[in-house]
């Protein structure tokens, strides 16, 4: 494994801290601001060096398309459920505080005794849906959407996206540098954001849906809005 320079270690630690505290990596602009680079090109050069040394993986065309590899992620645990019990089941994410990771302790309503491997790929958590914007895809108000945490998705997949301080569930489509978040209901508008901007952060992909009587709906079900 190649040795990292002091500057590369600083960037790696910044990425670790961002993932641990916010649930997603920094943008190039944020790296520049934090470490005093004059140009995003300087940050890009160091990121490419980190990728060559196996410390990170980079996804082209995404401002936050940086992922720590397993060998270097140890010092930056991702936000974890509020229990260490492996038999607790999948966390049910309800009300999400502005600026908090989805799996922050205060966002978890409870745990649902569902085997993650029932879904393909296996789910990491259940997100309580609010609203009818995905009605025609069979995702109703109060349903629990099984979500696989990921920073990449294909066109046509159901995705969980953070828009500023809101979390939404939509179909994904890319077109000419624009991310189109498409509802499955004729009364709701398509949301468009720049693919390389900071307005939208992909939190995961939908891999299944649960509804009553397996998991009763509660009064606080308002995680994913229209």
From Swiss-Prot:
Gene3D superfamilies attached to this UniProt entry:
Umud Fragment, subunit A (2.10.109.10), Winged helix-like DNA-binding domain superfamily/Winged helix DNA-binding domain (1.10.10.10)
Keyword set includes Ribosomal protein: no
Q: Cite the GO molecular-function annotations of the record.
A: DNA binding; serine-type endopeptidase activity
Superkingdom, natural source: Bacteria
| Coiled coil location | none
S-S bonds: none
Q: What's one Pfam family here? A: LexA_DNA_bind
Q: Name one GO biological process term.
A: proteolysis
Q: Which UniProt keywords apply?
A: Autocatalytic cleavage, DNA damage, DNA repair, DNA replication, DNA-binding, Hydrolase, Repressor, SOS response, Transcription, Transcription regulation
Q: Where is the active site?
A: 133, 170
Question: Which reactions are catalysed by this chain?
Answer: Hydrolysis of Ala-|-Gly bond in repressor LexA
Which residues are marked as site: Cleavage?
Answer: 98-99
What CDD domains does the record point to?
A: S24_LexA-like
Known EC number: 3.4.21.88
Q: Which residues bind DNA?
A: 28-48
Q: How does it assemble?
A: Homodimer.
**Which family would the database say this protein is a member of?**
Belongs to the peptidase S24 family.
Q: Which HAMAP family match?
A: LexA
**What does this protein's UniProt record list under function?**
Represses a number of genes involved in the response to DNA damage (SOS response), including recA and lexA. In the presence of single-stranded DNA, RecA interacts with LexA causing an autocatalytic cleavage which disrupts the DNA-binding part of LexA, leading to derepression of the SOS regulon and eventually DNA repair.
Name under which the protein is recorded: LexA repressor
């Amino acid at each position: 494994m190649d040795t990292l320079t002091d500057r590369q270690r600083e960037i790696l630690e910044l990425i670790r801290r961002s993932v641990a505290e916010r649930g997603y990596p920094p943008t190039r602009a944020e790296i520049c601001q934090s470490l005093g680079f004059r140009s995003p090109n300087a940050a890009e050069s160091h990121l490419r060096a980190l990728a060559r040394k196996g410390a990170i993986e980079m996804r082209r065309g995404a401002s936050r398309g940086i992922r720590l590899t397993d060998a270097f992620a140890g010092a930056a645990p991702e936000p974890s459920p509020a229990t260490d019990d492996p038999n607790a089941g999948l966390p049910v994410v309800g009300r999400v505080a502005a600026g908090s990771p989805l799996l922050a302790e205060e966002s978890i309503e409870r745990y649902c005794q569902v085997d993650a491997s029932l879904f393909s790929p296996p789910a990491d958590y259940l997100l309580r849906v609010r609203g009818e914007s995905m009605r025609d895809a069979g995702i109703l108000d109060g349903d629990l959407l099984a979500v696989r945490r990921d920073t990449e998705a294909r066109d046509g997949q159901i995705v969980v996206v953070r828009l500023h301080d809101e979390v939404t569930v939509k179909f994904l489509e890319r077109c000419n540098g624009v991310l189109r978040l498409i509802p499955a209901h004729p009364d709701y508008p398509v949301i468009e954001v720049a693919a390389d901007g900071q307005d939208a952060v992909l939190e995961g992909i939908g891999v299944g849906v649960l509804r009553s009587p397996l998991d009763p709906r509660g009064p606080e079900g308002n995680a994913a809005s229209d």
